[in-house]
Regions:
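Conserved class I S-adenosyl-L-methionine
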Residues: 11-21, 226
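Conserved SAM-binding loop of SAM-dependent methyltransferases across substrates and taxa
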Residues: 22-33
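Class I SAM-dependent methyltransferase SAM/SAH-binding core
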Residues: 31-66, 250, 256-258
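A solvent-exposed beta-alpha-beta segment
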Residues: 51-53, 216-271
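A conserved beta-strand element that flanks and buttresses the S-adenosyl-L-methionine
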Residues: 78-81
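A short glycine-rich, Lys/Arg-flanked "PGG" loop and its adjoining helix->strand segment in the class I
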Residues: 93-108
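Short, glycine-/aromatic-enriched active-site segment of Class I SAM-dependent methyltransferases
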Residues: 109-134, 138-141, 145
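Flexible, glycine-/basic-rich loop-and-beta segments that form/coincide
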Residues: 162-207
Length: 271
């Protein structure tokens, strides 16, 4: 709804969702705007489910080749979305440049990303793991988008994964007005010292203090039966950083795909 509300003033005749998963977001746009929709997602199971729900989905990565085929079919796209995709992409310059090439001056690009302010303020070490190759501040994001021909025109903070943000970008040629929220968050980032090493040092000091607290908390339970809850993607990172391996006897998870397996690098069974 947050993204859909942002699009009320924009034409949404053709919508593309990159990393479209089960197609639910595209279904929302189609129901609200009557849009022609297309999803791109390389994962077979969610792509197949999306197609079963009537959402056209190309089972592939967003690439130079897919961009050419999109242009052949639609010429330009009105709304492009990429929810929780930025952090997983190791070539953001090509990604954003390709997005910009599909846009016209009335197009909008909405994207969710891991927000550095939340990571620093809340000590979100669990978001820093092998699948997440980037975390952005606006201080880094704005010049990056400019390099790719895009301007950040609005920003909304959300609670996903402890703290993230949704950015809205338009082509630089559109000369679109910039929301006050962008300037407000830039001011906050300067106050937190994210334009220097100071802000990152605050994050380092916080998680090191948390590590000491966890060690003190677990010390009385050495030799006892200790279980964990949730074999999340970040579990290996947390176990390694907080040195939990010697204490954990098992981890409980409600995912049938994980039960009966072991955490990588640790002899901790998942029940």
């Amino acid at each position: 709804d947050l993204v859909a509300n942002q699009l009320d003033d924009h034409s949404a005749s053709v919508c593309l969702d990159i990393g479209s998963n089960d197609g639910l977001f595209l279904q929302t746009l189609k129901a609200r705007f009557g849009s022609e929709i297309l999803g791109i997602d390389p994962a077979h199971a969610p792509a197949e489910h999306a197609r079963s729900q009537g959402v056209e989905t190309w089972e592939e990565f967003f690439s130079d080749d897919s961009v050419l085929r999109i242009k052949d079919r639609f010429k330009k796209i009105d709304v492009i979305s990429a929810n929780n995709v930025f952090a997983h992409n190791d070539d953001l310059i090509s990604f954003a440049t390709n997005v910009a090439s599909l846009m016209h001056d009335g197009s909008v690009f909405s994207f969710e990303f891991s927000y550095l302010v939340d990571v620093v303020e809340k000590g979100l070490i669990g978001t820093v793991f092998h699948e997440h190759v980037s975390t952005h501040s606006l201080l880094s994001l704005i010049p990056f988008l400019n390099r790719c021909g895009l301007d950040l025109v609005d920003i909304k903070r959300i609670d996903t994964q402890g703290g993230a943000a949704i950015g809205f970008a338009k082509l630089h040629s559109a000369k679109a007005p910039v929301s006050e929220s962008v300037a407000n968050l830039l001011l906050l980032e300067h106050k937190l010292g994210l334009d220097t090493a100071r802000g990152i040092n605050i994050f380092r000091d916080r998680i090191m203090a948390d590590k000491i607290k966890v060690a003190e908390l677990l010390k009385p339970y050495a030799g006892e039966t200790v279980g964990g809850f949730g074999a999340a993607r970040s579990a290996n990172l947390l176990i390694d950083f907080f040195e939990l391996g010697p204490f954990l006897n098992f981890i409980i998870d409600d995912s049938p795909q994980k039960c009966g397996k072991w955490l990588n690098a640790f002899e901790v069974p998942i029940l």
